[in-house]
Amino acid sequence: MKPGGPYGDVYVLRLGHRPERDKRVTTHVALVARAFGANGFVLEGVCDEGVVESVRRVVARWGGPFTVECGVSGRRYVRMWREGGGEVVHLTMYGVNVDDVAPVIAASPRRKLVVVGAEKVERFYYEEADWNVSVGTQPHSEVAALALFLDRLFRGEWRFIDYSGGFLRVMESQRGKRVERKG
């Protein structure tokens, strides 16, 4: 499988990043997006170079393609995405259960923008989303929500993505750590 799978493009938009507080979690959102099949990561608002560089280093070592953008207006990005024919999936604990809607979302061939909040998400995103998807109805991590949603969207096929361009690859091992250098 190539990143984006049958949809061509799947991007993750991270809202409300607070540089002094969210570096690690936001970096993990981006890394989960990459590992679970998205084509890219978009950081709304402030451009946190620490997060951007961290993700780019992972892509250089482990392969891509995976794009990173930052400093965009989340509202404008969502509107642009919809105007371009894509659909918007907002992950929230107040939406429809992921297991009930993931097959319907996966059946649509349209490009996907997955919106993940950090702090209180504005009403705009609930209203503009084609889908408000709940991964559980209890407070938990946006990293977990994204991983579960992308797993359902790609039906587990993200495990077979071929990451070209990197020079490291983990080899399966019952015990210990095995990392192979490519090329």
Curated annotation (Swiss-Prot):
Q: Where in the cell is it found?
A: Cytoplasm
Q: Where does S-adenosyl-L-methionine bind?
A: L91, G117, A118, E119, K120, V121
Residue runs in coiled coils: none
Query: What are the record's GO terms for cellular component?
Result: cytoplasm
CDD domains the record matches:
aTrm56-like
Q: Does the keyword tRNA processing apply?
A: yes
Top-level enzyme category? transferase
Keyword annotations from UniProtKB, A to Z? Cytoplasm, Methyltransferase, S-adenosyl-L-methionine, Transferase, tRNA processing
Which Gene Ontology BP terms does the record give? tRNA nucleoside ribose methylation
Chief location bin: cytoplasm
EC number(s) of the enzyme?
Answer: 2.1.1.206
Keyword match Zinc: no
The GO terms this record gives for MF are:
tRNA (cytidine(56)-2'-O)-methyltransferase activity
Gene3D superfamilies xref list: 3.40.1280.10
Q: Which reaction does it catalyse?
A: cytidine(56) in tRNA + S-adenosyl-L-methionine = 2'-O-methylcytidine(56) in tRNA + S-adenosyl-L-homocysteine + H(+)
Q: How does it assemble?
A: Homodimer.
PANTHER family reported for this sequence: TRNA (CYTIDINE(56)-2'-O)-METHYLTRANSFERASE
What function is annotated for this protein?
Specifically catalyzes the AdoMet-dependent 2'-O-ribose methylation of cytidine at position 56 in tRNAs.
Q: Which family does it belong to?
A: Belongs to the aTrm56 family.
Q: What is this protein called?
A: tRNA (cytidine(56)-2'-O)-methyltransferase
What organism does this protein naturally occur in? Answer: Aeropyrum pernix (strain ATCC 700893 / DSM 11879 / JCM 9820 / NBRC 100138 / K1)
State the taxonomy lineage: Archaea, Thermoproteota, Thermoprotei, Desulfurococcales, Desulfurococcaceae
